[in-house]
Amino acid sequence: MKILIFIIASFMLIGVECKEGYPMGRDGCKISCVINNNFCKVECQAKWRQSDGYCYFWGLSCYCTNLPEDAQVWDSSTNKCGG
């Protein structure tokens, strides 16, 4: 019985983390939004079917969750927006 509890606790501690990030438009910039979660959800699901999305208020940009590991998202270190 102790082993079963240990195994279940181990699985709970491991967890499953998915990639998250800002989706990019064709210009390489983040997709803008103003408190419209539904718009962002549609944008995220158009690129990645199983993802979810919401409008990140402080950044005024869409933010996607539950992305596949190979998803290309906006990154400040490789930002090519506007150039």
Curated annotation (Swiss-Prot):
Post-translational modification: Contains 4 disulfide bonds.
Propeptide segments, given as residue ranges: 83
Comment block on domains: Has the structural arrangement of an alpha-helix connected to antiparallel beta-sheets by disulfide bonds (CS-alpha/beta).
Cysteine disulfide partners in this protein: C29-C81, C33-C55, C40-C62, C44-C64
PROSITE patterns: LCN_CSAB
Statement: the UniProt record of this protein carries the keyword Secreted: yes
Protein name according to UniProt: Putative beta-neurotoxin RjAa12f
